[in-house]
UniProtKB/Swiss-Prot annotation, chains A, B, C, D:
EC number: 2.5.1.104, 2.5.1.126, 2.5.1.79, 2.5.1.22
Effect of disrupting the coding gene: Cells lacking both speB and speE genes show defective growth at 70 degrees Celsius and significantly defective growth at 78 degrees Celsius. They accumulate agmatine and N1-aminopropylagmatine.
Residues bound to S-methyl-5'-thioadenosine: Q33, D108, D140, A141, P168
Temperature sensitivity of activity: Optimum temperature is above 80 degrees Celsius.
Sites where the protein binds spermidine: H64, E88, D158, L159, T160, D161
Subcellular location, record wording: Cytoplasm
Record text on subunit structure and interactions: Homotetramer.
Protein name: Polyamine aminopropyltransferase
Gene: speE
Gene3D superfamilies cross-referenced by the UniProt entry: Spermidine synthase, tetramerisation domain (2.30.140.10), Vaccinia Virus protein VP39 (3.40.50.150)
pH dependence per the UniProt record: Optimum pH is 8.5 at 60 degrees Celsius.
Domain PABS, first and last residues per copy: 4-241
């Protein structure tokens, strides 16, 4: 490690990733979070929100394809899509790749961060915000859902993890919130979400989210992928009342990719299916999990990766 | 990061993992490598050889199950097994779990390191070195293979990556070496190996190994898994002249796990199969790779992750 | 910074010194503190107690000569000497260099640490513990002084700084403690002490100690020296009721060094004198300081270097 | 150490100072050096050139008073002053505090860096560049001196250390360069200079500079001070053919400070004098030094702090 500028990210309480910064593009503090955007040699631009890397220029396609397309492809004809969070605009970009989409609403609480992304992160949004089908709402996702009567075919949840007892995102990880999402799904609708890192010493993040979503939806399926720029395996999930998302056949997915003319760089139909096959230790952790996060007793993750429940005192 | 002792591991040339050390159990220098063994809170004991983490107490089962069982399970009745490298003894331990095994020879060049493992790492070997079926040979694997007339049903290669132009392991990554291994396989035999990290900025490590093995064997299949303690995805491969290792049916694997009464913590038959399904970007990297590592022009990996070829000047 | 083992020491809350460890010689936890002893290339062995470097093999002579000889040389004939703290034995070693000394009592609370020093740090004590004039007492210095009726010509205080509200050393930094020391001085006696780092952002440590000692003694003189292995300037002071320690003439000191045949590596009579000349900003900080640390309201230093007073709840 | 941005500065080859950056104000690369300017909590703005901290907002007054006033005060009436280097403008600011000064020429090779300082570092220059007595020349100092016929009463040399064999500053550390400086001194003139860190493991930097200057000037006197923001002791020196700079009486300095109405924050006349009193180990290192840096065989400092001589291949 030569002299110069570095970013410290605490991947676990005991392991820290030190990333060399070639250049700091922007850094600051919105009303909701600290942000840092810098140039790195290995990953291009790197966006950090609060304590954790959010995405990197060179591998964001892996994260965003993994987040978006399983939900979009298990739905036969997603026309109206809601994105909860997703400030950089790349989730929106991937959603809009599906020609079936007529309207994509993105609700993010942090308008200032969205401006940073618009100005400094064109590699992410690639003009998606200007697509006539895109609607950007700057608001708390929960408040938005309580207000709107709109219904969606697909809802994509792209939030940061509820790390820390004072994290306001905790109320977006409760049964009540997932029921609110479900109430805004059209018949046959599906919810896809980023569902926490999967790490030996942090195993309960994903299991608790999975267990909680299960309270709200009939069918819940976890899947995972390795995100290089995070240096971690990440968990995702699909939830639906209409059908079991794991029951899709590879042939159907293959056909939809072709029909919708999707240009994918990471996913294939077989790989999409394989992501849903989980190793034994993770399956066991999912099975034995009993914690359900509720509005009254929402869960949060300690820096040590433990899941705890306590009332949220905004 | 509190005051105290830390270990710096350069995961890439631009990203360094800083691991908190609770206690240093042993550190030193054998004729072949530096070693560090320390206690960490998240992963238990951590073994570092030269620059890179080798395995950690708490997740070594993931690495060793992933390395050993695909090869052992695709073979109908592995009786004689050769392990190249594998100093800690956990590869040996996993091999010996198969009741079909009559003799397991482990050849490691670094006798001093094996002694460190025997004394300080019982969680890894769990007495495997004392199994009457185990034979430990302290020697250069290549010299051993050139000398011996023994034939094996399965050969497991568990070496460190050939990072650096002066790395003597380079001569264990050539077509000639793989042919030498093949020459010591019984009919129907299979080779399994650790085959390099899979990382955006280091993509060519695994592709070059894959491409090179393909010169020596009729059937070569890559697979991958995330190793939490490495904070990376790692590549592995199976090679055989007798059969396509990816053509096994899930049912057969399932049956063999049951018949051999294997106690596995991470692998299941479906997950084992899913590890062989690779994402599009990696498939493309494998396809377009043309570099073949030879004795005359063995490849090595630069710290930047580039693959280069140059004669080895021991 | 190559791969390997490092020690993190937080020199300030915003600046951390990362020291490369070639080898960890010993580390552990006594009932009173964490200790780390390691080999470094630049400074030889380095001893860390809790959060801070205590001394290093290659420059400990600078620290210990600076701490011990001003007090010993301003006294015309130091026969009986008390050392408060000083676990490594080098303070004792320097005291015993004065042939006038008949008895040197060292009181350190941490017997386990003294054992570590005896076994692993011979470069420090150089056999001082075996000198027939040396008496080692393992006890709390305050309890010892309350118990003993002995009187001393010189008392050397060699303690760690009272960083942190729960630091038991706080009660060894109060007016009452300094009065207790004074009560054990023979007529004409002098107290010398390590009195905290002198750093822009930590200015109040030394001023508060200075101001507090002034409550107990008629004459108090601060001096300072740069300790390379600490990467800091450190403050020291002499206190006496009998004479002004800054009033010594260079000639007298020169003569005493010669008479006592002192082999010094860092100090000379002129340099000893020059250490008492302080820069303007430090003089102003000493003058304007008003905080007096008392048993009822002992001071402590926050990690930010602020001095605060609060009752000590052992 | 919380998550966030840090700067790594290698104080020695084995010790690295990690400084927390609150905000990066500017960073870039001029034709001559890398620069980083950031905000820190403990020291305010911090300027790094290439590998090392250059000065910090909160303690630059210590460095610049130490560099400038000994030379200026030992001269009875400095009217014309030359500054070699000194990009930030604070050396110029201190020089201009002396009302005797009629013209102060600052020659710095790096015009781009001077622009950065003008725009982002007003706390340093405080408008000094706009003083009608100030003349800024962007040029190599050696070329400038070879060209000009001007003579000066005081020359202040404020350069970075010649670390690294390819460092162009090496030719500003030779006997020939010092003779060139001398040739531009008026009768009775004096040269003052920053003369390298003084550190146990880097002892030869200052001794070699001292020894080399001694070849060019009749009287050479080293002095030192601790620079908090560098976490090091730094060496300086005065050189003159006219008089011994260490022979000034405290009273004369005191009187000149008063007459010139100098507002000093760190220096006093006694402290100025005390800085010239060196400890025994440093005196011995100066005495035994034999290396003389010449144009044919200029010295440089290795990262390990060793002094070496070799022809410079620009």
């Amino acid at each position: 490690m030569d002299y110069g500028m570095y970013f410290f990210e605490h991947v676990t309480p005991y392991e820290t990733l030190v990333r060399r910064m070639e250049r700091v593009i922007a850094s600051g503090k919105t009303p909701f979070q600290d942000y840092f955007l810098f140039e790195s040699k290995g990953f291009g631009k790197v966006l950090i929100l609060d304590k954790d890397v959010q995405s990197t220029e060179r591998d964001e396609y892996i994260y965003h394809e993994t987040l978006v397309h399983p939900a979009m492809l298990t739905h036969p004809e997603p026309k109206r899509v809601l994105i909860v969070g997703g400030g950089e605009g790349a989730t929106l970009r991937e959603v809009l790749k599906h020609p079936t989409v007529e309207k994509a609403v993105m609700v993010d609480i942090d308008g200032e961060l969205v401006e940073v992304a618009k100005r400094h992160m064109p590699e992410w949004h690639q003009g998606a915000f200007d697509d006539p089908r895109a609607v950007l709402v700057i608001d708390d996702a929960r408040a938005y859902l309580e207000r709107t009567e709109e219904r969606y075919d697909v809802v994509i949840i792209d939030l940061t993890d509820p790390v820390g007892e004072d994290n306001p995102a905790r109320l977006l990880y409760t049964v009540e919130f997932y029921r609110l999402v479900k109430a805004h799904l059209n018949p046959g609708g599906v919810m896809g979400m980023q569902a926490g890192m999967i790490l030996l010493t942090h195993h309960r993040v994903h299991p608790v989210v999975h267990r909680t979503v299960r309270e709200a939806f009939r069918y819940v399926r976890s899947y995972k992928n390795h995100i290089p720029g995070f240096f971690l395996n990440f968990g995702f999930l699909l939830a639906s009342d209409a059908f079991d998302p794991a029951a899709f056949s590879e042939g159907v997915i293959e056909a939809r990719i072709r029909e919708r003319n999707l240009a994918l760089r990471h996913l294939t139909a077989p790989y999409l299916e394989a992501m849903f096959v989980l190793p034994k230790d993770l399956l066991e952790a999912l099975e034995k999990e009993t914690m359900v996060s509720t509005d009254q007793n929402p869960f949060y993750v300690t820096p040590e990766g433990e899941a705890r429940q306590a009332p949220y005192k905004g």
